[in-house]
């Protein structure tokens, strides 16, 4: 007999909890199915010395033939009438138990989210097994590509037409590690928290302090969640009254094209930075190298971010903020996870994106994002790669 079990995937973009969410624009994806065929086999005698029972053993007269599942699919219990066959390890020992992957404190990065269109665009969640996500939004484009891991852990967010003003917006890219929870939480909450804190602030120091409160509030809220795991690097760009406010915690980076010259607006937070290493050691932590990479407590390769409860004493959520007045020669802004920057330099990224952003009648922002992502992948990046491009002259 044969049995087909339809496994419904969650939508690529699910509703956001943000105040600006527009549920009408949620996208959905087609179903995928897992097909299993069970055929009866005549019991065969086996050697008494064999301690285990295989799929074709006398104790198991049914042979399971599994067709290759969809990419990223994790098998769960499959029901056959009143009985069930589990892909883990049923009591009869039909299938061999596998030791679960250990994810206590993540090493390395992985690191994605997409916005819902309306007068305000807000982050939503893609399927974890989604291979690629792209979006051409109102005044920005973004492209994200999954690395070699089973789940996409990068997220992004964008709110345009903020407070009904087309010259106000906030964008973000989030690179998760140790799971998607922290990046997803940040993408749904950080921009909202920043906007709430910044309202009414005029002085640059007040704005920078307000952004810091937004980051810290997001981190504190995430750590109160149940089953908190992993963390996320963050980079955000707030456009307010002609000012560009760029903040980061971790190694997501913001780079601006100024007349074709790359200008970094953020500095990566890694244990290899002298000031970061000194801060960590002063508070009782230690930094060492593992396979040539500087890590905190021999584990994490970034020194700031949202989450990372086990290392919270040293992995702080406080961002560094840089505020610039948008000028005419400020052409576009690149926000990207380290999946890009580990393989592509700041100037090279600007040189590749600029002809597509400025050299055509209609800017080909999405094509530029894809070109940068593909270049990093072609150079051997195994990480998730997320690139967002934002033309800046629209805000002058």
Swiss-Prot record:
Gene Ontology process terms (BP): abscisic acid-activated signaling pathway; defense response to fungus; response to fungus; response to wounding
Known cofactor(s): Mg(2+); Mn(2+)
Mutagenesis or variant effect for residue 99 to Q: Abolishes interaction with MPK4 and MPK6
Signal sequence coordinates: none
PROSITE patterns in alphabetical order: PPM_1, PPM_2
Loss of function: phenotype: High jasmonate production and PDF1.2 expression upon wounding. Slight reduction of lesion size caused by fungal pathogen. Slight decrease of spider mite reproductive performance.
Disordered: region residues: 32-98
GO molecular function, one term: metal ion binding
Keyword flag Hydrolase: yes
Catalytic activity entry: O-phospho-L-seryl-[protein] + H2O = L-seryl-[protein] + phosphate; O-phospho-L-threonyl-[protein] + H2O = L-threonyl-[protein] + phosphate
Pfam families given in the database record: PP2C
Residues where Mn(2+) 1 binds: 175-176
Any one cellular-component term (Gene Ontology): nucleus
Gene3D superfamilies, per database record: PPM-type phosphatase domain
UniProt-listed Enzyme Commission number(s): 3.1.3.16
Cited SMART domains: PP2Cc
Quaternary structure (record): Interacts with MPK4 and MPK6.
Family: Belongs to the PP2C family.
PANTHER family listed in its UniProt record: PROTEIN PHOSPHATASE
Function statement: Protein phosphatase that negatively regulates defense respones. Inactivates MPK4 and MPK6 MAP kinases involved in stress and defense signaling.
Name of the protein this chain belongs to: Probable protein phosphatase 2C 25
Species of origin: Arabidopsis thaliana (Mouse-ear cress)
